[in-house]
Amino acid sequence: PAHRRFFDPAHYRIIVTDQRGAGRSKPLGDLTDNTTDHLVADMEALRERLGLDSWFLFGGSWGSSLALAYAIAHPERCRGLILRGIFLCRRPEVDWFMTGMRRVFPEAWRRFSEYLPEAERHDLLTNYHRRLIDPDPDIHLPAAKIWAQYEGACSTLLPSADAASSFADPAKSLGLARIEAHYFVNDLFMPEEHLLNGVERFRHMPGVIVQGRYDMVCPLVSADALSRAWPEADYVIVPDA
Protein backbone atom coordinates (compact mmCIF):
# COMPACT_ATOMS: atom_id res chain seq x y z
CA PRO A 1 0.00 0.00 0.00
CA ALA A 2 2.81 2.46 0.77
CA HIS A 3 4.06 2.25 -2.80
CA ARG A 4 0.66 2.20 -4.48
CA ARG A 5 -0.43 5.44 -2.87
CA PHE A 6 2.01 7.44 -5.01
CA PHE A 7 -0.21 6.84 -8.04
CA ASP A 8 -3.85 7.47 -8.93
CA PRO A 9 -5.41 4.06 -9.65
CA ALA A 10 -8.00 5.76 -11.84
CA HIS A 11 -5.20 6.79 -14.18
CA TYR A 12 -2.51 4.12 -13.77
CA ARG A 13 -2.45 0.37 -13.68
CA ILE A 14 -0.27 -0.17 -10.62
CA ILE A 15 1.89 -3.30 -10.48
CA VAL A 16 3.74 -3.99 -7.23
CA THR A 17 6.26 -6.82 -7.02
CA ASP A 18 8.31 -8.50 -4.31
CA GLN A 19 11.65 -9.74 -5.59
CA ARG A 20 12.91 -13.29 -5.09
CA GLY A 21 13.23 -14.18 -1.44
CA ALA A 22 11.72 -10.94 -0.11
CA GLY A 23 8.32 -9.69 1.01
CA ARG A 24 5.60 -12.15 0.05
CA SER A 25 7.81 -14.10 -2.36
CA LYS A 26 8.44 -17.66 -1.22
CA PRO A 27 10.53 -19.16 0.15
CA LEU A 28 11.46 -16.14 2.26
CA GLY A 29 15.17 -15.38 2.22
CA ASP A 30 15.92 -17.94 -0.49
CA LEU A 31 19.15 -17.20 -2.36
CA THR A 32 18.82 -19.81 -5.10
CA ASP A 33 19.39 -18.19 -8.51
CA ASN A 34 19.11 -14.83 -6.78
CA THR A 35 21.20 -12.31 -8.74
CA THR A 36 20.58 -8.97 -10.39
CA ASP A 37 20.28 -10.62 -13.80
CA HIS A 38 17.67 -13.04 -12.43
CA LEU A 39 15.65 -10.15 -10.99
CA VAL A 40 15.76 -8.22 -14.26
CA ALA A 41 14.65 -11.38 -16.08
CA ASP A 42 11.80 -11.78 -13.56
CA MET A 43 10.61 -8.25 -14.31
CA GLU A 44 10.68 -8.89 -18.04
CA ALA A 45 8.82 -12.19 -17.60
CA LEU A 46 6.18 -10.37 -15.53
CA ARG A 47 5.76 -7.70 -18.21
CA GLU A 48 5.27 -10.36 -20.85
CA ARG A 49 2.87 -12.35 -18.64
CA LEU A 50 0.72 -9.26 -18.12
CA GLY A 51 0.70 -8.48 -21.83
CA LEU A 52 2.25 -5.04 -21.46
CA ASP A 53 4.13 -3.51 -24.37
CA SER A 54 5.98 -1.09 -22.05
CA TRP A 55 5.74 0.42 -18.60
CA PHE A 56 7.00 3.13 -16.26
CA LEU A 57 9.36 2.00 -13.49
CA PHE A 58 9.25 3.45 -9.99
CA GLY A 59 11.76 2.46 -7.32
CA GLY A 60 13.78 3.67 -4.37
CA SER A 61 17.08 2.60 -2.83
CA TRP A 62 17.76 -0.89 -4.23
CA GLY A 63 14.59 -0.44 -6.26
CA SER A 64 16.27 2.47 -8.04
CA SER A 65 19.23 0.21 -8.82
CA LEU A 66 17.00 -2.51 -10.21
CA ALA A 67 15.00 -0.03 -12.30
CA LEU A 68 18.22 1.30 -13.81
CA ALA A 69 19.50 -2.22 -14.49
CA TYR A 70 16.23 -3.10 -16.22
CA ALA A 71 16.29 0.10 -18.29
CA ILE A 72 19.82 -0.72 -19.45
CA ALA A 73 18.79 -4.25 -20.43
CA HIS A 74 15.39 -3.39 -21.94
CA PRO A 75 15.21 0.31 -22.85
CA GLU A 76 12.62 -0.36 -25.51
CA ARG A 77 10.21 -1.59 -22.81
CA CYS A 78 10.48 1.49 -20.57
CA ARG A 79 8.28 4.57 -20.89
CA GLY A 80 10.21 6.38 -18.19
CA LEU A 81 11.84 6.13 -14.76
CA ILE A 82 10.84 7.66 -11.43
CA LEU A 83 13.65 7.08 -8.95
CA ARG A 84 14.17 8.13 -5.34
CA GLY A 85 16.95 7.51 -2.84
CA ILE A 86 19.52 6.53 -5.43
CA PHE A 87 21.81 3.53 -4.89
CA LEU A 88 24.35 2.91 -7.68
CA CYS A 89 25.78 -0.38 -6.37
CA ARG A 90 29.31 0.94 -5.94
CA ARG A 91 31.73 -0.26 -3.29
CA PRO A 92 31.90 3.08 -1.42
CA GLU A 93 28.12 2.92 -0.94
CA VAL A 94 28.37 -0.54 0.60
CA ASP A 95 31.28 0.58 2.79
CA TRP A 96 29.23 3.57 3.90
CA PHE A 97 26.38 1.30 4.97
CA MET A 98 28.62 -1.13 6.82
CA THR A 99 30.90 1.37 8.59
CA GLY A 100 30.40 4.95 7.42
CA MET A 101 27.03 5.59 9.04
CA ARG A 102 28.69 5.37 12.45
CA ARG A 103 29.77 9.00 11.88
CA VAL A 104 26.13 10.07 12.16
CA PHE A 105 24.57 7.21 14.15
CA PRO A 106 27.40 5.97 16.40
CA GLU A 107 25.08 4.42 18.97
CA ALA A 108 23.17 2.43 16.33
CA TRP A 109 26.42 1.31 14.73
CA ARG A 110 27.83 0.18 18.08
CA ARG A 111 24.82 -2.08 18.62
CA PHE A 112 25.30 -3.40 15.08
CA SER A 113 29.04 -4.03 15.32
CA GLU A 114 29.15 -5.22 18.92
CA TYR A 115 26.69 -8.01 18.20
CA LEU A 116 29.67 -9.81 16.69
CA PRO A 117 32.56 -11.09 18.81
CA GLU A 118 35.40 -8.58 18.97
CA ALA A 119 37.65 -10.82 16.86
CA GLU A 120 35.14 -10.63 13.96
CA ARG A 121 34.47 -6.90 13.92
CA HIS A 122 37.27 -6.17 11.46
CA ASP A 123 35.05 -7.53 8.67
CA LEU A 124 31.41 -6.94 9.53
CA LEU A 125 30.04 -7.91 6.14
CA THR A 126 31.76 -11.29 5.88
CA ASN A 127 30.90 -12.30 9.41
CA TYR A 128 27.30 -11.12 9.29
CA HIS A 129 26.86 -12.86 5.95
CA ARG A 130 28.16 -16.13 7.41
CA ARG A 131 25.53 -15.96 10.15
CA LEU A 132 22.71 -14.85 7.88
CA ILE A 133 23.12 -17.78 5.50
CA ASP A 134 23.47 -20.32 8.31
CA PRO A 135 20.51 -22.76 8.12
CA ASP A 136 20.00 -22.68 11.90
CA PRO A 137 17.26 -20.14 12.79
CA ASP A 138 18.88 -19.64 16.19
CA ILE A 139 21.86 -18.21 14.32
CA HIS A 140 20.38 -16.38 11.32
CA LEU A 141 17.28 -14.83 12.90
CA PRO A 142 19.02 -12.86 15.68
CA ALA A 143 21.64 -11.61 13.20
CA ALA A 144 18.91 -10.55 10.79
CA LYS A 145 17.07 -8.67 13.52
CA ILE A 146 20.17 -6.72 14.54
CA TRP A 147 21.03 -5.89 10.89
CA ALA A 148 17.48 -4.70 10.17
CA GLN A 149 17.28 -2.64 13.36
CA TYR A 150 20.54 -0.92 12.41
CA GLU A 151 19.19 -0.03 8.98
CA GLY A 152 15.89 1.10 10.45
CA ALA A 153 17.58 3.35 13.01
CA CYS A 154 19.55 5.08 10.26
CA SER A 155 16.78 5.32 7.67
CA THR A 156 14.83 8.35 8.91
CA LEU A 157 15.84 11.97 9.46
CA LEU A 158 14.25 11.98 12.91
CA PRO A 159 13.81 8.96 15.21
CA SER A 160 10.68 7.03 14.24
CA ALA A 161 9.19 4.32 16.42
CA ASP A 162 7.01 3.16 13.53
CA ALA A 163 9.99 2.74 11.21
CA ALA A 164 11.99 0.95 13.88
CA SER A 165 9.17 -1.48 14.63
CA SER A 166 8.61 -2.27 10.94
CA PHE A 167 12.26 -3.20 10.52
CA ALA A 168 12.09 -5.40 13.63
CA ASP A 169 9.44 -7.68 12.12
CA PRO A 170 11.08 -11.16 11.93
CA ALA A 171 9.84 -11.93 8.42
CA LYS A 172 10.89 -8.56 7.04
CA SER A 173 14.25 -8.61 8.80
CA LEU A 174 15.28 -11.99 7.39
CA GLY A 175 14.31 -11.13 3.82
CA LEU A 176 16.03 -7.77 4.14
CA ALA A 177 19.26 -8.71 5.90
CA ARG A 178 20.04 -12.03 4.24
CA ILE A 179 19.44 -10.74 0.73
CA GLU A 180 21.28 -7.46 1.30
CA ALA A 181 24.32 -9.29 2.66
CA HIS A 182 24.16 -11.79 -0.22
CA TYR A 183 24.19 -8.99 -2.77
CA PHE A 184 26.83 -6.95 -0.93
CA VAL A 185 29.36 -9.80 -0.70
CA ASN A 186 28.86 -10.45 -4.42
CA ASP A 187 29.36 -6.81 -5.47
CA LEU A 188 25.66 -6.55 -6.36
CA PHE A 189 26.31 -8.94 -9.26
CA MET A 190 27.42 -6.16 -11.60
CA PRO A 191 30.58 -4.27 -12.58
CA GLU A 192 31.39 -1.27 -10.37
CA GLU A 193 30.17 1.49 -12.70
CA HIS A 194 27.59 -0.52 -14.65
CA LEU A 195 24.61 1.68 -13.84
CA LEU A 196 26.32 4.98 -14.63
CA ASN A 197 28.03 3.60 -17.72
CA GLY A 198 24.69 2.36 -19.02
CA VAL A 199 22.91 5.73 -18.96
CA GLU A 200 23.35 6.13 -22.71
CA ARG A 201 20.99 3.19 -23.18
CA PHE A 202 18.02 5.05 -21.71
CA ARG A 203 18.87 8.76 -21.52
CA HIS A 204 16.30 9.52 -24.23
CA MET A 205 13.37 8.56 -22.01
CA PRO A 206 11.64 10.74 -19.39
CA GLY A 207 13.17 10.52 -15.94
CA VAL A 208 12.73 11.97 -12.46
CA ILE A 209 15.33 11.67 -9.69
CA VAL A 210 14.14 12.55 -6.17
CA GLN A 211 16.60 12.57 -3.29
CA GLY A 212 16.38 13.53 0.38
CA ARG A 213 19.35 15.71 1.23
CA TYR A 214 19.88 13.94 4.54
CA ASP A 215 19.29 10.37 3.38
CA MET A 216 21.83 8.42 5.40
CA VAL A 217 21.34 4.98 3.88
CA CYS A 218 21.59 6.24 0.28
CA PRO A 219 23.65 9.46 0.51
CA LEU A 220 23.00 12.29 -1.91
CA VAL A 221 26.35 11.83 -3.66
CA SER A 222 24.89 8.94 -5.67
CA ALA A 223 21.88 10.91 -6.87
CA ASP A 224 24.22 13.75 -7.77
CA ALA A 225 26.39 11.39 -9.83
CA LEU A 226 23.35 10.01 -11.66
CA SER A 227 22.04 13.51 -12.35
CA ARG A 228 25.37 14.56 -13.83
CA ALA A 229 25.45 11.47 -16.04
CA TRP A 230 21.79 11.96 -17.01
CA PRO A 231 21.21 15.74 -17.10
CA GLU A 232 18.05 15.30 -19.16
CA ALA A 233 16.25 13.85 -16.12
CA ASP A 234 14.44 16.13 -13.68
CA TYR A 235 16.39 16.26 -10.41
CA VAL A 236 14.67 17.21 -7.16
CA ILE A 237 16.45 17.44 -3.80
CA VAL A 238 14.07 17.45 -0.85
CA PRO A 239 15.79 19.79 1.64
CA ASP A 240 14.50 18.38 4.94
CA ALA A 241 14.33 14.65 4.23
What does each of the following model-derived ranges do?
Residues L39, L57-G59, R84, V210:
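Short beta-strand immediately N-terminal to the catalytic nucleophile in serine-hydrolase-like folds
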Residues L220-D240:
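Catalytic histidine neighborhood in serine/cysteine hydrolases
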Residues F7-K26:
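Conserved alpha/beta-hydrolase
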Residues E76-Y128:
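A catalytic-pocket lid/entrance helix-loop region that shapes and gates access to the active site
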Residues F202-R203, I209-Q211, D215:
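Short beta-strand/loop motif that positions the catalytic acidic residue
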Residues P191, M216-S222:
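Conserved alpha/beta-hydrolase "acid-adjacent" motif
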Residues S64-P75, L81:
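Short glycine-enriched nucleophile-adjacent loop
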Residues D37-F56:
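Conserved acidic catalytic loop of the alpha/beta-hydrolase fold
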